[in-house]
From Swiss-Prot:
Coiled coil: none annotated. Keywords: Cell membrane, Membrane. It is found in: Cell membrane. Pfam families: YidD. Transmembrane segments: none annotated. GO terms for cellular component: plasma membrane. Could be involved in insertion of integral membrane proteins into the membrane. This is Putative membrane protein insertion efficiency factor. The lineage of its organism: Bacteria, Bacillati, Actinomycetota, Rubrobacteria, Rubrobacterales.
Length: 70
């Protein structure tokens, strides 16, 4: 149940907020898509922690690249 709510919030962000800003994520998939996939696969606690760690690694000095949910 909590996982569905988290995914709903992430999808709302992807649909309504993200298009207002230029693309800036250095990773593929984007950080918000990574968060959706992590929560779907591991649940809101572990998936949320994985997503938070990913966002912390997404900064101008990061090399970025392909980083799928594993």
């Amino acid at each position: 149940m909590a996982g569905r709510l988290v995914i709903l919030v992430l999808r709302a962000y992807q649909r309504f907020v993200s298009p207002l800003f230029p693309p800036s994520c250095r990773f593929t998939p984007s950080c918000s898509q990574y968060a959706v996939e992590a929560v779907e696969r591991y649940g809101p606690l572990k998936g949320g922690a994985m997503a938070a760690w990913r966002v912390l690694r997404c900064h101008p000095f990061s090399r970025g690249g392909v980083d799928p949910v594993r």
